[in-house]
Amino acid sequence: MIEKSQACHDSLLDSVGQTPMVQLHQLFPKHEVFAKLEYMNPGGSMKDRPAKYIIEHGIKHGLITENTHLIESTSGNLGIALAMIAKIKGLKLTCVVDPKISPTNLKIIKSYGANVEMVEEPDAHGGYLMTRIAKVQELLATIDDAYWINQYANELNWQSHYHGAGTEIVETIKQPIDYFVAPVSTTGSIMGMSRKIKEGHPNAQIVAVDAKGSVIFGDKPINRELPGIGASRVPEILNRSEINQVIHVDDYQSALGCRKLIDYEGIFAGGSTGSIIAAIEQLITSIEEGATIVTILPDRGDRYLDLVYSDTWLEKMKSRQGVKSE
């Protein structure tokens, strides 16, 4: 056997996690804002963590075998992560998606060989989540040995982030953390990471960033275009009492946040990252200078070239929000 250095992994899956953290000096010069670059996971997003954790847990406990057919409703990133891992482990996968998935994400999922079921009808809230869930239930009833990942209700979702990025953040940041800011959709990442962070930094304030029009925190549903943030249902794994503050951001603000991040820091990240940047800009107007803020950048920008990085899309969102051109 050829001797390998510690830097050489046996599998691509071994490279999930241990993502770098950078301080956003240029964008937030009066505060210490540290961003964990979750888009540097091999599948391009933080969703690699729950995908790997849930599948490996299922295999370990006999819930997933070589004959299992994985099923999940996804807006893109988890679908990519599951497709990557399913390909490596030789498992069948069907992703239930909707028309708001970015064209790039859809192509990546298909390139990995996963089956794709596209729903077309929006649900009662104007989104597609409940329609996707109904399709999942239909597939579970018709496919033998099907296993539903069920990210909105699966406790393994938040546990993957608790043991993963949450632990890595605590190991990296030695000074007191004043605020942890994270986007929400399934709420697995904010629940898992914040629980780990609070163990070492009990005074940290947990700030959720949600999309305007999302119903997670009780707001009325309105039409949303940006995938990967917000939801048209309340996730079962959410514990609202653990969230100190919620900041809602619209699609236009999110796009501007993405563009500011690349202009000031050279970081090319996805739509929900723009939401985070916009939320932190709001947060710092009401907190002390020099506060330590920790956040995550969930996915890569190249998956949003037709969305937040499209001038045509930006103008459409600007018009929708009633913003006047200068």
UniProtKB/Swiss-Prot annotation:
CDD domains membership: CBS_like (cd01561)
Catalyzed chemical reaction(s): O-phospho-L-serine + L-glutamate = N-[(2S)-2-amino-2-carboxyethyl]-L-glutamate + phosphate + H(+)
Record-listed E.C. numbers: 2.5.1.140
Record's keyword terms, sorted: Pyridoxal phosphate, Transferase
Keyword Mitochondrion: no
GO terms under biological process: cysteine biosynthetic process from serine
Binding residues annotated for pyridoxal 5'-phosphate, in chain numbering: N77, S185, T186, T187, G188, S189, S272
Swiss-Prot/TrEMBL cofactor(s): pyridoxal 5'-phosphate
Induction context: Up-regulated under iron-deficient growth conditions. Repressed by Fur under iron-rich growth conditions.
InterPro entries referenced in this protein's UniProt entry, alphabetically: Cys_Synth/Cystath_Beta-Synth (IPR050214), P-phosphate_BS (IPR001216), SbnA (IPR023927), TrpB-like_PALP (IPR001926), TrpB-like_PALP_sf (IPR036052)
NCBIfam families hit by this protein: PLP_SbnA_fam
Record's protein name: N-(2-amino-2-carboxyethyl)-L-glutamate synthase
Source species: Staphylococcus aureus (strain N315)
